[in-house]
């Protein structure tokens, strides 16, 4: 957390040459990511998750954490020449945030195909690599596995036509108010 206000550190007439640093005296490292967050929540609700995700060569502790919830990691792929996706988020005292995001291994998520298993009752396509989200939507539809399309922060990656197709293929759509407005404008 930055103990001040970003607005007091950024000179509006100088943003074209922005070069600013924020001292953040506290740091927390947490596990996150859509697949992990969904699996964690599902486990705490008594459900069983089958996680399909990509991690980097630094992801073994996350695999162990997912397994500790009772979730399957059968479809978690480790990309040895990448780091796991990660975000550095700085929050000021007004809860404004600046985020730097490195997709890392997530950029290879499309190399894992949706498993054709009869025991999958519902899938969720949440923010992931762009190509993976498109391919997995089609693969789920082809396998007749019902799914939720939750584009979240990945929504800006897609054209209006791509979004319409994924919405058409999906059984459910999950967006917040802002994402809903953006989806409406893009389509």
List each model region and its residues.
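Detector for Asparagine
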Residues: 19, 37, 57, 95-96, ...
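Conserved alpha-helical elements of sugar-nucleotide-dependent glycosyltransferases
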Residues: 34, 58, 132
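Short, compositionally biased leader-like segments
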Residues: 57, 63-64
């Amino acid at each position: 957390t930055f103990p001040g206000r970003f607005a007091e550190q950024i000179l509006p007439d100088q943003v074209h040459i922005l070069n600013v640093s924020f001292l953040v005296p506290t740091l927390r490292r947490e596990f996150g990511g859509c697949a992990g967050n969904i699996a964690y929540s599902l486990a705490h609700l008594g459900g069983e998750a089958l996680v399909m995700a990509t991690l980097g060569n630094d992801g073994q502790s996350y695999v162990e954490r997912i397994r500790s919830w009772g979730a399957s990691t059968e479809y978690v792929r480790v990309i040895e020449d990448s780091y796991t996706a990660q975000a550095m988020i700085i929050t000021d005292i007004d809860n404004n945030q600046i985020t730097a995001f490195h997709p890392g291994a997530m950029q290879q998520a499309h190399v894992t195909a949706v498993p054709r298993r009869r025991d999958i009752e519902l899938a969720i396509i949440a923010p992931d690599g762009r190509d993976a989200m498109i391919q997995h939507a089609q693969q789920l539809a082809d396998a007749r596995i019902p799914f939720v399309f939750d584009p979240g922060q990945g929504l800006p990656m897609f054209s209006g036509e791509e979004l319409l197709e994924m919405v058409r293929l999906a059984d459910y759509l999950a967006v917040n108010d802002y994402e809903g407005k953006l989806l409406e404008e893009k389509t």
